Amino acid sequence: MGCLITSGRKVPCKSAVGGIKTIYFADYGTLGNATIVAGEITGVSGTPDWFQFDVKGNSSMETAITSSRENGTTFYDTTLNMTLTFQDKATQEELKLIAHARPHVAVEDYNGNFFLVGLENGGDVNGGTIVTGAAMGDLTGYTLTVNAQETAPPFFVTS
């Protein structure tokens, strides 16, 4: 029996908040080997350049667990939705590069947690918009959807 449950969980305090604060992109393959201790990445052997995108509101990360008893398989399908307000040429060019690439993605939430999306396979942009909005209060900016399918959920990161 290699799949034994090892612990439970009590109801935590109501101190968490939703949302993503910052998203970082690094070129695929630049992480090198990750050191994973107790389900947490504590370091990488590579020297990736991380490119920071600050986001506010309407950005989220969700991981669906897909498991098949018939096939004996389980994988994790993570979807990262990001919204960037305001349009400018430099951002549009970077988003074009990201859309053509398969980056590793680090996500910082508003609870101070960092997650690594696409450790093994990278992430793929599978949608997005460049929008001007119609009314004065509408979004003018960019939306981007990044998807990563992995054999493990996004790892917590300590460094």
Model-inferred region functions:
Residues E120-S159:
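Mixed-charge, glycine-accented linear interaction segment located at domain edges/termini
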Residues G72, L95-L97, A106-V107, A134-D138:
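A general structural signal for short secondary-structure junctions and capping/turn motifs
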Residues S68-K89, D138-A152:
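Oligomerization/assembly interface segments of phage tail-like spikes and tubes
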Residues K89-K96, F155-V157:
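Short, conserved charged micro-motifs
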Residues R9-N81, G122-M136:
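Solvent-exposed edge beta-strands and adjacent loop segments
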Residues A90, N113-F115, A152-P154:
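Residue-level signal for secondary-structure boundary sites
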Residues E93-V117:
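Short, acidic/charged, Gly/Pro-enriched secondary-structure junctions
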